[in-house]
Structures are given as C-alpha cells and as structure tokens.
Amino acid sequence: MKQVVYIANSESKNIEVWNLCKSGKMNLIQKIETDGKIQPINIIQKRNLLYAGIFPDNKIITYSINHNGFLEKKNESNIPGKANYISFDKKKEFLFCSSYHSNFISVSPLNKFGIPQNPIQIIYNIEGCHAAKMNYKYNILFVISLKEDCIYLYYLTDFGILKSTEQNILHTQKKSGPRHIIFHPNQDFIYTINELNGTIDVWKIYKKNNVIKVKNIQNIHVLKNRFLKDYWCSDIHITSCGRFLYACDRFFNIISLFHINQNDNKLVFFKSYDTEEQPRSFNINSHNTHLIVAGEKSNTFIIYSISNSTGELKKINVYSTGQRPVWILIHALC
C-alpha cells in the first residue's frame, strides 16, 4: 500500500507532499500554495479529501487527493475564526472546527461532495478551545479548553447539533492546560496531554445505570523523574494496536514512549528521545512501522522506525521542509 506524508508549513504558506517508501526513505513529490498561513490539516480517507485551516482570512480549503497522493484544490469555506483543530463525526457528515484564539467550537455539515457548508452551530466562551474529537463508540464530542483546565462533553444529535451530556465537564489539574486528545482503539479509554504542566491524563469512559460516565484513572509526567516548572507539551498519538503511546514536548525537544498496560490501559513510562527542535506535531503510519516528527523551529522533520515488540524508535533520516511546519499527516492511499 502506497503511503504519502502531508506537511503543513505555516510561514511558507504551503503543503508539502512526500512519498514514503517501506524502507522509510522519503522524497518530495508536490508543493502546493495555500493562499494564507496554514495550521490544522485532516483527511477523510474514504472520500480522498484533505481539509486545511487557513488564516488570517479564516477559511477551510478542501483538496482532493488523487491516486498518487497529489492535492488539487476543490473549494473554500468560510469559518468564523482561526482554525486550530479539525475533526469529523463517525459518518463523516459533519466537520468540527476548534478555535483557540476565538474561543469556540463550530459544527459544519458536509455536503454530498464532502464540502463544508456554513456552520449550523457555534458554541462560544470555550476559553482556549484547542481541540475537539469525537468518541465514536459513545457518540460524545470531547472539546478541550486549555485556558479553563477542562474538557467539555457533548452528544451529537442526528441533525448535527451538540447538546451537553449528563456529566458535561471534566476538570484537569489547575494550570495544566489540556491541549490534545486521543482515544484507545477500544474507545473506552482517553488520553489527554497537558501543555503547561507536562503530564498526560488517562480517563475511563463507561456506562452506569444507562448513563455515560468518565473518570480520571491516572496522571503521569512526560519526563520520568523530572518535575520542573516549565513545560510546553504539544502532541500525543497511540499505535493502532493499542500497545504504545507517544507524546512530545517543545521546551525539552523530546518525544517520550509509554507502554500501555494491557490490563487496565494505564501508562508506563519507557523512554524519552531527543528529537527535532520544537516538535509541535508528529504522526504514526497505519501499519505502526514509522513515526515522523516535525520540528517547528528547525524546519526539519525526522522519520523513525518503530519496533514492533517494544515500540522503541530508531532514527532513519532527517529531511528539510518549509518554514514552521505545524502539522503532519501520514496517509495510506487506497
């Protein structure tokens, strides 16, 4: 299966498309201008569409992905503020846009061609709304408020309207600054990375008396035995096998590996690796064989191989990219 890598370079105002070989060797195959600074990108695989959040004009550009991974611009859709995170519902009928700077989450229907329409709902006053992601098993959108140290929970109705759950808010530690979120493949466990205090929270989601509950079961530092005053954590991802979790910090320029306990799904710190300067974004391929980290300040990205048995990372190569790479995705072509 052919793989391509998309890198969003904010200051260069472009998306680079790289071919990824099984060996880990990479080569640049396309560079497409975005008519503005770019931040989040995301893909709907079954539609072969890539969505990019652009500012300062505040819009989402939709690109088609051809059989070789090349991008072609299809449409522009206006949004009410700067996009920081893009995600979708399970059926890929709605697009959720988080805005850290404008403090909102918006819901935009996708038409039959996958093009975002005008938002049908905007929820304001979510301070520092850095990310929102749907738990497909429980039909709950987790909306992260970095500045409030909390996570809001919303059900998604059939018409795309969000409504608060019975337990409508999760509180993280004070001044922790929750930033990004991932789900275990079984969807029963949630992992959130806290930007400001250098920790990861582990949450369990379950039903009790036919009501969905979420409880915190662990808080663990991204650096073992280093409890410092300043952190600047950024991204978090889990392998599709559910055995390994990775998290990075931009202040220390590291990426840490955790093993996931197969009995309770809590995290066990394993190892940290020095990586590219200011690692804002990284991604894991669908076969769990490679991990790529983009250095926002170094304007480079590094590709590692992943050990199938331990999750350990082994450097393959470092490549130069555009100015200020802020988002990276690995896409398997159908």
Curated annotation (Swiss-Prot):
This is 6-phosphogluconolactonase. Pfam families: Lactonase (PF10282). It is an enzyme of class 3 (hydrolase). Pathway: Carbohydrate degradation; pentose phosphate pathway; D-ribulose 5-phosphate from D-glucose 6-phosphate (oxidative stage): step 2/3. It catalyses: 6-phospho-D-glucono-1,5-lactone + H2O = 6-phospho-D-gluconate + H(+). Catalyzes the hydrolysis of 6-phosphogluconolactone to 6-phosphogluconate. InterPro entries: 6-phosphogluconolactonase_YbhE (IPR022528), Cycloisomerase_2 (IPR050282), Lactonase_7-beta_prop (IPR019405), WD40/YVTN_repeat-like_dom_sf (IPR015943). GO terms for molecular function: 6-phosphogluconolactonase activity. Keywords: Carbohydrate metabolism, Glucose metabolism, Hydrolase. Its EC number is 3.1.1.31. Belongs to the cycloisomerase 2 family. The gene is pgl. GO terms for biological process: glucose metabolic process; pentose-phosphate shunt, oxidative branch. GO terms for cellular component: cytosol.
